């Protein structure tokens, strides 16, 4: 199948991902083995093993440079191509909006790419430039021992490319991030929600048509969740 990666324009020249027509092979039973390998699931690598196996050879070699949004987009596109856009639940779930009991739902997605592609925030004497997270970034974050105890500051450490504070001679990025005022932290979250690329997956309630955020993991590829 051929997909258009949401962030294809953001890759450097020569990247195998910088194309509007990116080829993904149809999954086989061998690919399914990778997806449901219990050891790899436990380590958090099963989804990456699965996606990498679907890519052309050069893209496999540069898989770590793929943006997370594009990886998730491929997972979504493959799932819909395999099973359609309807998800059945093993047990009824309740719509958080209207309280309806759902046995199945329609899955959908939305890509948001802001017009301003610099991803820069100037606020409160700080100048912050954000970057797009890659598969390699996620793998480093997964191994970071501080992620559990310092989730917010460590997440910002990876999503922030550079940070400067007016009048400060501190150059250590993490030290500057830890000194960010709470009021600026609110501005950063607002910026990331409105001025930073997103790929959201959600299900639609058949009763009230409301959308419910949907988390993607290995079970995303089962016929019934």
Regions found by a protein language model. Give the residues of each.
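Short, surface-exposed, charged amphipathic helix/loop patches that serve as local interaction elements
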Residues: 1-225
């Amino acid at each position: 199948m051929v997909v258009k990666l949401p962030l294809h324009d953001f890759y450097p020249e020569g990247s195998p991902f910088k194309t509007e027509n990116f080829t993904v092979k149809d999954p086989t039973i061998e690919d399914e083995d990778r997806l449901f390998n219990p050891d790899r699931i436990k380590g958090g690598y099963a989804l990456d093993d699965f996606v990498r196996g679907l890519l052309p050879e050069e893209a496999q070699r540069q898989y770590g440079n793929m943006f997370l949004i594009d990886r998730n987009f491929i997972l979504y596109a493959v799932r819909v191509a395999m099973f359609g856009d309807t998800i059945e639940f093993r047990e009824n779930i309740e719509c958080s909006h209207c309280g309806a009991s759902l046995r199945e739902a329609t899955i959908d997605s939305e890509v948001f790419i802001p017009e301003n592609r610099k991803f820069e925030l100037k606020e409160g004497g700080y100048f912050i430039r954000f970057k797009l997270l890659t598969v390699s970034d996620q793998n480093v974050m997964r191994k970071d021992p501080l992620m559990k105890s310092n989730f917010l500051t460590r997440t910002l450490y990876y999503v922030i490319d550079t940070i400067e504070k007016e009048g400060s001679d501190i150059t250590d990025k993490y030290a500057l991030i830890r000194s960010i005022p709470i009021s600026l932290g609110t501005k950063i979250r607002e910026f990331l929600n409105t001025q930073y690329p997103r790929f959201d997956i959600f299900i639609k309630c058949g009763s009230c048509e409301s959308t419910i955020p949907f988390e993607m993991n290995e079970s995303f590829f089962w016929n019934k969740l």
